[in-house]
Regions:
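Hot-dog-fold acyl-thioester-processing enzymes
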Residues: 1-85
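Hydrophobic beta-sheet segments that form the core/acyl-binding groove
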Residues: 85-109
């Protein structure tokens, strides 16, 4: 186990790798059925006719999986202080079954 991290231990520009996560079409559909049941997330035929041309992950599913990487690979449970929130969250490109995303935390301020 590494040493606990406190606010004073961080330096601007520090990078912390979070690892990777791969999405499957089934988990995309399962998540969306429960939390974001829009046709392009849950219905293959409707999704084909959409601007995306197929099933895509809910942005909230993507955010949730990235949060899991963050907690598993970055948060020190001994010194966790909660989160002050997010300043910006954007989904720039659709995520599909088979896609793998990799996260990195960069200390900005």
């Amino acid at each position: 186990m590494t040493e606990p991290r406190y606010w004073d231990d961080y330096e601007v520009g520090q990078k912390f790798p979070l690892g990777s996560t791969t999405f499957t079409e089934q988990e995309i559909v399962d998540f969306a059925r429960q939390f974001d049941p829009q046709p392009f997330h849950i219905d293959a035929e409707a999704a084909k006719q959409s601007m995306y041309g197929g099933i895509i992950a809910s942005g909230w599913h993507v955010a949730s999986k990235m949060m899991r990487l963050f907690v598993d690979n970055y948060v020190d449970r001994r010194t966790a202080l909660g989160s002050p929130g997010l300043d910006e969250l954007r989904w720039l490109k659709p995520v599909r079954g088979g896609d793998t995303l990799t996260g990195t935390v960069i200390c900005a301020a």
